[in-house]
Amino acid sequence: MQRNMLKSKIHRAVVTHCELHYEGSCAIDENLLEAANIVENERIDIWNINNGERFSTYAIKGERGSGMISLNGSAARRAQLGDLVIIAAFANVDEEELKAGWKPDLVFVDDKNAIKGSRDHVPTQSWT
């Protein structure tokens, strides 16, 4: 059996550009793409923390080291400059890979979209 699992996440990135008339996509700083194991043209889901919008597009390379998160084409209507977003990608993983310890790549950024940390799991949520 295959399970559709979280593969990659860039958590709380800041939208730096909205380019309505650019060919549709989301340009992401190459450093972030590599850290999160997202490749060019891979489908990504974007969840806007500020307004609750959730949409899908595909990733393209943004200038390395720029901190760029550019929503392009119709995606530009889903956020404003400065909005916080979560960018996620998923993969089909078989049971054997899961049993062998398969883990996602989770990347955490600061307010300039510089990497401040990473890990391979989401902590258990508690009521404290």
Swiss-Prot record:
Biochemical pathway: Cofactor biosynthesis; (R)-pantothenate biosynthesis; beta-alanine from L-aspartate: step 1/1
* EC number(s) per entry: 4.1.1.11
Q: Which residues are recorded as modified (Pyruvic acid (Ser))?
A: 25
- Statement: the UniProt record of this protein carries the keyword Calcium: no
- UniProt-annotated location(s): Cytoplasm
- Fetch the NCBIfam families from UniProt: panD (TIGR00223)
What does the function comment of this entry state? Catalyzes the pyruvoyl-dependent decarboxylation of aspartate to produce beta-alanine.
- What's this protein's name? Aspartate 1-decarboxylase
Write down the species: Paraburkholderia phymatum (strain DSM 17167 / CIP 108236 / LMG 21445 / STM815)
Taxonomic lineage is: Bacteria, Pseudomonadati, Pseudomonadota, Betaproteobacteria, Burkholderiales
